[in-house]
């Protein structure tokens, strides 16, 4: 794309949550690559955080954007969830849903799908309330800082989750590797990183705005996770991709990795 990499200032000024949600999270029952991508992530997260999966006390979601779908499974297995995003608008959108404010985005179809995966299709309202009770805070984050949640300081977490965010925040492979190390600093030794990364994606559209990404190969993501001090427990590469007009990626990579114990 022209004009250089879209950094934090551009996101703060031009990233409109409702345009983003309308493009990627409509989930109205009609088939689309975007709906299939959402289902892929919900299914992976259900398997990761469902019965017999990861559990603990604290989970930090980095780069939440204006979305809550990514913690629907985790709210059953963690007691304290932190959501975070760089932009004011995205954090405001999250707070609006958490506080049931008028005009909040309607996640009902997505919550119902998550409940179906859990075998509780009729309990979507209870699921929403469980999630609202489990999310304890919404913080600003910047993955390029040594403490991505600064100035907030949280105890080391049992799990860090980041979906479809890191590749959009980093302008190069080196920046991505450094950001992963920053995320690792938020975890306890033995804690888990759970991430989905779009592969070979150089930019994506939000409304009429184009936002840049670092185009990553699966092998680069895998090596970056290892270099950040993790052992990879699961790596799933899928050809799942978005509509070419929205985000011309070439598959995705879902990873569960465990932070190595300290010396």
From Swiss-Prot:
E.C. no? 2.1.1.49, 2.1.1.96
Any one annotated GO CC term: cytosol
Superkingdom of the source species: Eukaryota
N6-succinyllysine is carried by which residues?
13, 96
Listed PROSITE patterns: NNMT_PNMT_TEMT, SAM_MT_NNMT_PNMT_TEMT
Per the record, the GO terms for biological process are:
amine metabolic process; methylation; response to toxic substance
Coiled-coil zones: none
As its record notes, the protein acts as a catalyst of: a tertiary amine + S-adenosyl-L-methionine = a methylated tertiary amine + S-adenosyl-L-homocysteine + H(+); a secondary amine + S-adenosyl-L-methionine = a methylated secondary amine + S-adenosyl-L-homocysteine + H(+); a primary amine + S-adenosyl-L-methionine = a methylated primary amine + S-adenosyl-L-homocysteine + H(+); dimethyl sulfide + S-adenosyl-L-methionine = trimethylsulfonium + S-adenosyl-L-homocysteine
Q: Does the keyword Transferase apply?
A: yes
Q: Where in the cell is it found?
A: Cytoplasm
Gene3D superfamilies found in the cross-reference section: Vaccinia Virus protein VP39 (3.40.50.150)
The UniProt keyword set, sorted, is: Cytoplasm, Detoxification, Methyltransferase, S-adenosyl-L-methionine, Transferase
Q: Name one Pfam family in it.
A: NNMT_PNMT_TEMT
Q: What is its main location?
A: cytoplasm
Q: Which GO terms describe its molecular function?
A: amine N-methyltransferase activity; N-methyltransferase activity; thioether S-methyltransferase activity
Residues given in the record as S-adenosyl-L-methionine binding sites: 20, 25, 63-64, 69, 85, 90, 142-143, 163
Per the entry, what this protein does is: Catalyzes the N-methylation of tryptamine and structurally related compounds. Functions as a thioether S-methyltransferase and is active with a variety of thioethers and the corresponding selenium and tellurium compounds, including 3-methylthiopropionaldehyde, dimethyl selenide, dimethyl telluride, 2-methylthioethylamine, 2-methylthioethanol, methyl-n-propyl sulfide and diethyl sulfide. Plays an important role in the detoxification of selenium compounds.
Family per similarity comment = Belongs to the class I-like SAM-binding methyltransferase superfamily. NNMT/PNMT/TEMT family.
Q: How does it assemble?
A: Monomer.
**What is this protein identified as?**
Indolethylamine N-methyltransferase
The organism of origin for this protein:
Pongo abelii
Q: What is the lineage of its organism?
A: Eukaryota, Metazoa, Chordata, Craniata, Vertebrata
């Amino acid at each position: 794309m022209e004009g250089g990499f879209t950094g934090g200032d551009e996101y703060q000024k031009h990233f409109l949550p409702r345009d983003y949600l309308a493009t990627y999270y409509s989930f109205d029952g009609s088939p689309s690559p975007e709906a299939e991508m959402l289902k892929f992530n919900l299914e992976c997260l259900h398997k990761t955080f469902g019965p017999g999966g990861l559990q603990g006390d604290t989970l930090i979601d980095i780069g939440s954007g204006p979305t809550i779908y990514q913690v629907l499974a985790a709210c059953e297995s963690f007691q304290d969830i932190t959501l975070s995003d760089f932009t004011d608008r995205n954090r405001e959108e999250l707070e609006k849903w958490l506080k049931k404010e008028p005009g909040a985005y309607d996640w009902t179809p997505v919550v119902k799908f998550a409940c179906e995966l859990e075998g509780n299709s009729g309990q979507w309202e209870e699921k929403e309330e469980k999630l609202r009770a489990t999310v304890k805070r919404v913080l600003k984050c910047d993955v390029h800082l040594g403490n991505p949640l600064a100035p907030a300081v949280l105890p080391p977490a049992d799990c860090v989750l980041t979906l479809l965010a890191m590749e959009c925040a980093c302008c190069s492979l080196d920046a991505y590797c450094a950001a992963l190390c920053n995320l690792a600093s938020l975890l306890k030794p033995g804690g888990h990183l759970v991430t989905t990364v779009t592969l070979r994606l150089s930019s994506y559209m939000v409304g009429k705005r184009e936002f840049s990404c670092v185009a990553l190969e699966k092998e680069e993501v895998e090596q970056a996770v290892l270099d950040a001090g993790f052992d990879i427990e699961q790596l799933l590469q899928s050809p799942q991709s978005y509509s070419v007009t929205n985000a011309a990626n070439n598959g995705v990579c879902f990873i569960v990795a465990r932070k190595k114990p300290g010396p």
